[in-house]
Swiss-Prot record:
Pathway: Aromatic compound metabolism; salicylate degradation. It comes from Pseudomonas putida (Arthrobacter siderocapsulatus). This is 2-hydroxymuconate tautomerase. Homohexamer. The gene is nahJ. Keywords: Aromatic hydrocarbons catabolism, Isomerase, Plasmid. Pfam families: Tautomerase. Its EC number is 5.3.2.6. The active site is at residue 2. NCBIfam families: PRK02220.1, taut. InterPro entries: 4-OT, 4-OT-like_dom, Tautomerase/MIF_sf. Belongs to the 4-oxalocrotonate tautomerase family. One of its GO terms (molecular function) is isomerase activity. It catalyses: (2Z,4E)-2-hydroxyhexa-2,4-dienedioate = (3E)-2-oxohex-3-enedioate.
């Protein structure tokens, strides 16, 4: 059972997350020759002040 664990910054819509799950699942199924029903995708949303880019919190960088 292939599992993808994705970390993204908070703020994406449910529709965007659904698209991400679908497209990652399709890519994993295709590239690993695994039935899509066996693919799992876990999304962890992080607050922008819990993620750093270039030594600064993403919240300060307007990301």
């Amino acid at each position: 059972m292939p599992i993808a664990q994705l970390y993204i910054l908070e703020g994406r819509s449910d529709e965007q997350k659904e698209t991400l799950i679908r497209e990652v699942s399709e890519a994993m199924s295709r590239s690993l020759d695994a039935p899509i029903e066996r693919v799992r995708v876990i999304i962890t949303e992080m607050p922008k002040n819990h993620f750093g880019i270039g030594g600064e919190p993403a919240s300060k960088l307007n990301r």
